[in-house]
Amino acid sequence: MLDINLLRKDLPSAIARLETRKSPQTFLNVEAFQTLEAERKAVQIRTEELQGQRGTLSKQIGQLKSKGEDASAVMALVSHSKAELESSAKRLEQIQTEMQALLLAVPNLPHDSVPQGIGEAGNVEVRKWSPFEGLGGEPAALSFEPRDHVDVGQPLGLDFELGTKLTGSRFTVMKGPLARLHRALSQFMLDVQTAEHGYTECYVPYIVNSDSLRGTGQLPKFEEDLFAARKGGQEGQAENAALYLIPTSEVPLTNFVRDEVVPEAQLPLKFTAHTPCFRSEAGSYGRDTRGMIRQHQFDKVEMVQVVHPEKSYEALEAMTGHAEVILQKLGLPYRVMLLCTGDMGFGATKTYDLEVWLPAQSTYREISSVSNCEAFQARRLQARFKNAQGKNEFVHTLNGSGLAVGRTLVAVLENYQRADGGVDIPAVLQPYMGGMTTLSLPAA
C-alpha cells in the first residue's frame, strides 16, 4: 500500500508515476480520494474544536461547583459535545476504512531506474550467460532437431492425460526417475539457497487466510487468480473465515513479520521454502496450453528477504544473483531482463526476470522473477523495525523464485536431451539421483 502522506503531499507526482505503468485502467480514483481527504480534514478540525470546547466546559463545571452554583446547563453542553465527538470519531474511522479500501487497489510506484514501456516489448536485457565458451553468453545449437519437453518427457514418465483424468486441464503426473529428478531439483535448490546464500529453510502452511493474502497484495484485487479452500462465513467468526491455497510461498514467508517489530540487529531476515503453488491462471485461456509451462499446480523454491530500507536495492541485486547461481550450476543458458513499468507486478518497485533458453521453442522463457517491494507490503502488513533513534519504521520486503521447479525441469529436458531419446542428468543433480547419469527410455 502506498504511503498516504506521499499522496497528500504531492498527489500529481504520484499519479504521474502510476501512469508510467501504462495501464488502460485508472489505478486511483482521484475524485474519491480528494473527497474523502477533504472530509477527513473537516471532521478532524471539528473534532479538535470539540475537544477544546469540552476541556473549557469541564473547567467551567469545576469552577461553578466549587462556588456552589448550578452547573447543569454547562453539563448539558458537555453531554452534547460528547455525543458529537463520538459521532465524529465514528465518521473518522469510516473514512479511514474507505480510504484504505481505495488504496488497497493501487499498485506500487515504479523506481526511477525502471524503463518505461508497455508489456514484454518494453523490457530491457541486462546480461546473458551460457556454459559455452566463445559464444558471448549465447546458447549452443544441438546437433540434432530438438524436441520439446512434452515429446522428450512423455516416454520418460510425464503424463498429462492422467493429470487431466484425475483433476482437469493444466495438471501433470510424473512417475519413476523423472519424478525423482523433479524432486532432486527442489532439494538441490534448497541446499544452495541455505548453505551458500544463508537463507533459513522453512516449512509453511499451503493454506492461508485472507489477512495473509491482503498483506502481500493478492487480495482484494486478484481474488480471481486464487483457489479458495473455504469460502468465508460471517464476519468476525474466525472458524468460518475464508481460506485459500497459496499462489506462492512468498505469502506465508512474508507474513512471518506481519504486525511485528523486528529488532534492527536481526535484519536482514532471509527465508526460503519449497512448496506447491496453486493458481487459477485467470486471463490465461489459450496461452501455453501444451506442456508444463503454465499449470494450475506447480512447485517452486521461493526466496524472501526482509531488510533495512537502505539495503533493499543491494538485496535485489544479490537475490537476482542467488537465482542465477542455480541456473549456472545446472549449466542452463539464460538471460536477465529488467522489466519495464508496464510489465511489473502489482507490488513491485523494480523487478528482474530470469529467462531460461528452451531450444525447441528457440526462445527464452521466464523461470524466475525477483522483486523489490520497498515498504509497499510492509505497510499493509504493519511490519516494522525499531531504528537507531528508537522509532518504529517500515521494513522493506523482497521476493524471488529460486527457482520454479517445473520450468527448470522443462529446461533440463530440452537442453540435456539426447538424440536417442534419453536425457543426460546435470552433474550437480547426480548425487540426488543415487549416482544416475542418464534418464534412459524404458526397454521396449
Swiss-Prot record:
InterPro entries: aa-tRNA-synt_IIb, aa-tRNA-synth_II, aa-tRNA-synth_II/BPL/LPL, Ser-tRNA-ligase_type_1, Ser-tRNA-synth_1_N, SerRS_1_N_sf, SerRS_core, tRNA-bd_arm. GO terms for molecular function: ATP binding; serine-tRNA ligase activity. The keyword Aminoacyl-tRNA synthetase applies. It is found in: Cytoplasm. Its EC number is 6.1.1.11. GO terms for biological process: selenocysteine biosynthetic process; seryl-tRNA aminoacylation. GO terms for cellular component: cytoplasm. SUPFAM superfamilies: Class II aaRS and biotin synthetases (SSF55681), tRNA-binding arm (SSF46589). It catalyses: tRNA(Ser) + L-serine + ATP = L-seryl-tRNA(Ser) + AMP + diphosphate + H(+); tRNA(Sec) + L-serine + ATP = L-seryl-tRNA(Sec) + AMP + diphosphate + H(+). The keyword Thylakoid does not apply. Keywords: Aminoacyl-tRNA synthetase, ATP-binding, Cytoplasm, Ligase, Nucleotide-binding, Protein biosynthesis. L-serine binds at residues 248-250, 302, 401. Pfam families: Seryl_tRNA_N, tRNA-synt_2b. Its main location: cytoplasm. CDD domains: SerRS_core (cd00770). Coiled coil: none annotated. Gene3D superfamilies: Bira Bifunctional Protein, Domain 2 (3.30.930.10), Serine-tRNA synthetase, tRNA binding domain (1.10.287.40). Pathway: Aminoacyl-tRNA biosynthesis; selenocysteinyl-tRNA(Sec) biosynthesis; L-seryl-tRNA(Sec) from L-serine and tRNA(Sec): step 1/1. Homodimer. The tRNA molecule binds across the dimer. Catalyzes the attachment of serine to tRNA(Ser). Is also able to aminoacylate tRNA(Sec) with serine, to form the misacylated tRNA L-seryl-tRNA(Sec), which will be further converted into selenocysteinyl-tRNA(Sec). Consists of two distinct domains, a catalytic core and a N-terminal extension that is involved in tRNA binding. PANTHER family: SERINE--TRNA LIGASE, SERYL-TRNA SYNTHETASE. This is Serine--tRNA ligase. The lineage of its organism: Bacteria, Pseudomonadati, Pseudomonadota, Betaproteobacteria, Burkholderiales.
